[in-house]
Amino acid sequence: MILTTADTLGKREIIEYKGLVTGIIVRTPTITQGILGGLKNIIGGKNTSYTNVCKEARLHAEQEMINQAKELGANAIVAIRYDSSSLGGNTSGTEVFCYGTAVVVR
């Protein structure tokens, strides 16, 4: 599966547009990640616990989008965009949403 944030694929020709595909996931840190992340917030520095949660969430959302594209018979996704937001309240979760256009290229 070819993935790009660009609207075109250079020399490859888009021969069919299959439609919008999306991926969304909400991830919360484990208890250990939450404790380590909380300590890092106090002392400062790179917060690898939360960074890893965000990376994992992005990969899962992206995989969900890819699976949708495959179901449509696409072999590429163009114009991919990502968005994320943190959940407020008593949770420290992160929502990651991605979307793009599933296409067939040759």
Curated annotation (Swiss-Prot):
Superkingdom per UniProt: Bacteria
One Pfam short name: YbjQ_1
Entries under SUPFAM superfamilies matching the protein: YbjQ-like (SSF117782)
Signal peptide: none
Cross-referenced HAMAP family: UPF0145
Family (UniProt): Belongs to the UPF0145 family.
Protein name: UPF0145 protein FTL_1249
Taxonomic lineage from the root: Bacteria, Pseudomonadati, Pseudomonadota, Gammaproteobacteria, Thiotrichales
